[in-house]
């Protein structure tokens, strides 16, 4: 996997075959794509199946690993060093854009919020209120920072909860939302 965040690249290599081309990949990213920096996030267990150690770190000169990006009109600070996978799920771009069509004037709950991307898109789209929850305090802190970056802190809030624990309780308490976003982590690894 190669993810591009402005002029910075994050690579994640899971197989022995691609691992042998790491240096060439970095060289091409720097020389042909003018990468300002390349960071490796091959800190995944699937590498062990191929007899590879997990790896994480700079493949060029060090740089600030909090990279600001804009997607669908929403600003994010992506933590490519400590965020999940490569720091941001770029493949969800169109799903985040689709949120705009259903959230205006609604109360929204975003479970497993991670960087707050779905919650922030709901806020930008004009949601009445948004609550994003995640089991990781680090994720909640990053999402809160992203809400502040977009001046959405009055509408979009984040709390540290395990969705599996609180959803049943909230249902019994009568808490209701107009839109509930569920994007849980993978339950099985391929």
Please tell me what each predicted stretch does.
Residues 1-7:
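Short intrinsically disordered, low-complexity coil segments enriched in acidic
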Residues 3, 21-88:
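Non-catalytic substrate-recognition/targeting regions of SAM-dependent transferases
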Residues 8-13:
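Carbohydrate-binding surface patches
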Residues 14, 43, 185:
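Flexible loop residues that form catalytic
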Residues 16-18:
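Helix N-cap motif at beta-to-alpha junctions
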Residues 61-190:
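Rossmann-like S-adenosyl-L-methionine
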């Amino acid at each position: 996997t190669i993810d591009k965040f402005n002029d910075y690249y994050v690579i994640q290599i899971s197989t022995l075959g691609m691992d042998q081309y790491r240096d060439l990949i970095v060289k091409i990213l720097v020389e042909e794509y003018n990468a300002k920096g390349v960071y490796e996030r091959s800190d995944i267990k699937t590498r062990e199946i191929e007899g590879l150690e997990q790896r994480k770190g700079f493949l060029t000169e060090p740089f600030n690993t909090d990279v600001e990006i804009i997607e669908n009109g929403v600003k994010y600070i992506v933590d490519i060093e400590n965020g999940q996978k490569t720091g941001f799920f770029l493949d969800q771009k169109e799903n985040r854009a689709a949120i705009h069509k259903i959230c205006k004037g609604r109360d929204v709950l975003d479970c497993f919020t991670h960087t707050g991307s779905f919650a922030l898109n709901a806020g930008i789209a004009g949601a009445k209120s948004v609550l994003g929850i995640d089991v990781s305090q680090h994720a909640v802190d990053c999402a809160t920072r992203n809400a502040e970056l977009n001046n959405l802190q009055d509408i979009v809030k984040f709390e540290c909860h395990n969705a599996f624990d609180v959803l049943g309780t909230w249902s019994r308490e009568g808490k209701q939302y107009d839109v509930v976003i569920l994007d849980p982590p993978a339950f099985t690894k391929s």
